[in-house]
């Protein structure tokens, strides 16, 4: 079965749309994307998708919708996935490049928050960096 995919119309998708040259040429996507201010709509969509046979529930973007993820974790028995989208990644990378944040600490906190909110699966552009950091922290003698 397909995964339930809960996402909202909002600004976090801009970097991906720009990179993929997939910004709408006309009109907008509001007619089929949920209102980002309405968490209950996202939950209704999750429950509807489960009734239709979803095997996994995916919430994206991750950081802005931790409340939806947490609520789903308390009410849904399916595995919960969260997608740390390109906009979230770009914000971290830009701030780190400017020396405003410690990238490793921010990424670790962000992904930990997603796990704490109930994600069993985390999809992120930070995966390779996080794997490297985890391997370094598990190196004997350090």
Language-model-derived ranges and their functions:
Residues 11-12, 61-77, 129-135:
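Active-site-adjacent beta->alpha loops and helix N-cap segments on the catalytic face
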Residues 49, 114:
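Conserved, mostly hydrophobic/aromatic
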Residues 2-7:
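Short, small-residue-biased leader/transition segments that mark boundaries at the very start
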Residues 21-43, 92-108:
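Active-site mouth loops of central-metabolism enzymes
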Residues 54-55, 118-119, 127:
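A structural motif
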């Amino acid at each position: 079965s397909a995964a339930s995919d809960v996402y909202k119309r909002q600004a976090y998708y801009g970097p991906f749309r720009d990179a993929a040259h997939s910004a709408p040429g006309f009109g907008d996507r509001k007619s089929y994307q949920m209102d980002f201010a309405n968490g209950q709509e996202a939950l209704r969509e999750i429950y509807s998708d489960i009734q239709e046979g979803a095997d996994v529930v995916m919430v994206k973007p991750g950081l802005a919708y931790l409340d939806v993820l947490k609520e789903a974790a308390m009410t849904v028995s399916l595995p919960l996935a969260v997608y740390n989208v390109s906009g979230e990644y770009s914000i971290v990378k830009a701030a780190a490049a400017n020396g405003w944040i410690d990238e490793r600490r921010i990424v670790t906190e962000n992904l930990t928050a997603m796990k704490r909110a109930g994600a069993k699966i985390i999809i992120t552009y930070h995966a390779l960096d996080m794997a490297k950091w985890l391997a370094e922290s598990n190196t004997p003698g350090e």
